[in-house]
């Protein structure tokens, strides 16, 4: 008796299921308004036993995501989308949870689709997709990790005011780009940022880099014995058979920590030949603090590292002294002067060339005398300055960069030049004598000379 109404009910439910399925597909293509909320109460009866032959009600999204459909005359916006349209839901550092007020419906839809329930047919709002289409795909927003902002806001919810303040116009927040730029700058080598860090980082009040030594050996109000031996360092340039150690004083360590070098713990440990260890930098800083020197953690060097940076002052001065000895004794000044003098044998040019050699010798002497008056502290010596503070500070800068090697090495090279000039002047004097003798012989052989008169008397 009841079969016709039951068949009619089954047919109506079947049509309802078909309509819901196609309307959901249509809604995925169109950004429409949900209109099936009134029919959700009827979907539960479809999954009953007598109607098990009905097709599954779960909607599986296709792998190829279709961009949102815009009816004519509107054109689709340039849209960059990944293969998986819902991959951003599981990404804790994605910007979608932060900039979409519809975060809870998105999460609800994900849970419904994973569970393959009939409730997955509930349409979800797509209003955020046109906004996300304007994002710059070249920006790497995942490098800025702020889980405390991106995650906690989802749990507590976003009200209207917070949603407005966290809209898409705030994507260009300077803090995000600054973090990335600072990280990139830290991985680079010696660049402009390395120099700016030293100038801008607040220096502790007891830092050595901001304090200068005075005459009494006091450093920033603390009594520091600059002549005290800090450690002994084996030489780097000596042979194994003649290895020598050089004493490093507290004053030398202070000069390495001060401008212009401002060495950090790693470079200072290399200069002092300290073995690398897990807590090597910490132990070095603690030892320096005991003698009144402060080495801030994480500081950056201010000057480029050269081969002279690895030498202690004792070895640098030793190298300059050996170089001066070789320039004094082994430089072929006489051979070079004779070779160059042979290229200028014109008698008319001898006088002017001799004047040029004398002027050059005088200039070299003045320059050497200036360098000899340099009173930069070296080792445990603290000589009193002779030159004016302006020129002395410039010479001190050069000496600190070269660890005391620069000025003695230049003086040694100028000594070799002076020896060449001396030998060249001696050669010029010999050339003058030879020319004078030649002129005399030439004048003696002519008529009217004393030699010619004697020969005529002898003939008579």
Curated annotation (Swiss-Prot):
Residues 121-132 have a biased composition (Low complexity). It is found in: Nucleus. Residues 35-51 have a biased composition (Polar residues). InterPro entries: TF_AP2, TF_AP2_beta, TF_AP2_C. Pfam families: TF_AP-2. Residues 451-460 have a biased composition (Basic and acidic residues). There is a cross-link at residue 21 (Glycyl lysine isopeptide (Lys-Gly) (interchain with G-Cter in SUMO)). Keywords: Activator, Disease variant, DNA-binding, Isopeptide bond, Nucleus, Phosphoprotein, Transcription, Transcription regulation, Ubl conjugation. The modification Phosphoserine is found at residue 258. Sumoylated on Lys-21; which inhibits transcriptional activity. Binds DNA as a dimer. Can form homodimers or heterodimers with other AP-2 family members. Interacts with CITED4. Interacts with UBE2I. Interacts with KCTD1; this interaction represses transcription activation. Interacts with CITED2 (via C-terminus); the interaction stimulates TFAP2B-transcriptional activity. This is Transcription factor AP-2-beta.
